[in-house]
């Protein structure tokens, strides 16, 4: 199940957390994996651990020219990208009434506009080959909202609308477009929470635990596989029941 041998995947934001887990899981399923990120040393460490079938593609997603070059280089070096995982994202949290234009623009540029640009770059060759899997990592807050994150929530909600629209445009070319929406996932950020904060979070989650990055990555592996050929325009929520959507 979920066999990906010979498929070529590009994973953005692969230098840690969920992105790293996605890269590891896709590689374990047999894919050739392109690792994108800005922390080159971390990418090199991950590549060394994975061994063969790995290529590195460092780039700044807030730079229009670098995004275009990333798509072109990945397509050339991987000899065709079959699977695109738009995972990279940033936050610039703050109350809406105090949010600066820069904080809004920066988050939307990386989390949404770069997704548009990179996906556009790689969709054309996918259409020519009549095969592709585009998987966008959004968030539960893209559906529920979250105070202090109007910019981030807007970017993640935008990804969902983007994915549904694109899915309808290119379905006849055997290209699927889907989202995976994580909830609270164990990470370096959640490790910094104190016990009281963690208890408050757990109380809101029916499973009474946080998810793991591997659980998110497993949903990505499914959507990337042939088994998900009839699934498009959908959002898989990996949140332990925090939001039953």
Swiss-Prot record:
InterPro entries: 3oxo_ACP_reduc, NAD(P)-bd_dom_sf, Sc_DH/Rdtase_CS, SDR, SDR_fam. Substrate binds at residue 139. The active site is at residue 152. SMART domains: PKS_KR. Keywords: NAD, Nodulation, Oxidoreductase. GO terms for biological process: fatty acid biosynthetic process. One of its GO terms (molecular function) is NAD binding. CDD domains: BKR_SDR_c (cd05333). NAD(+) binds at residues 11-35. Proposed to modify Nod factor fatty acyl chain. Belongs to the short-chain dehydrogenases/reductases (SDR) family. PANTHER family: 3-OXOACYL-(ACYL-CARRIER-PROTEIN) REDUCTASE, 3-OXOACYL-[ACYL-CARRIER-PROTEIN] REDUCTASE FABG. This is Nodulation protein G. The gene is nodG.
